[in-house]
Amino acid sequence: MPFGHTFDRLGSVKYFTWDDAKNEKLKADRGIGFEEIVFLIGQGHVLDILEHPNQQRYGGQRIFVIQRDNYVYLVPFVEDDRLIALKTIIASRKATKQYLEREPDDHET
């Protein structure tokens, strides 16, 4: 079911969609749902967009890297001319370390 929208680089409207049953399961199991992901995207909390590393199995999928508070979530998605279909939400300790826990510079004390 589409919820919310965003604009691509050319100004075209894109609608978000997802599986409602999957969304309810994510909220129950992980404490976060697709509605919040769409809100965070709209608020500029996208740290990166990656190609899915397993294109053979998940061809065409990309991954939003989203910051929520002090943690990073990976959100696989597929996109066409008018829809962005969100697939799941994965809390990632590895991505949190990579994107949010920067190494201090040598000149910092």
What are these regions, as identified by a protein language model?
Residues 1-109:
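Ribonuclease/tRNase effector modules and their secretory precursors
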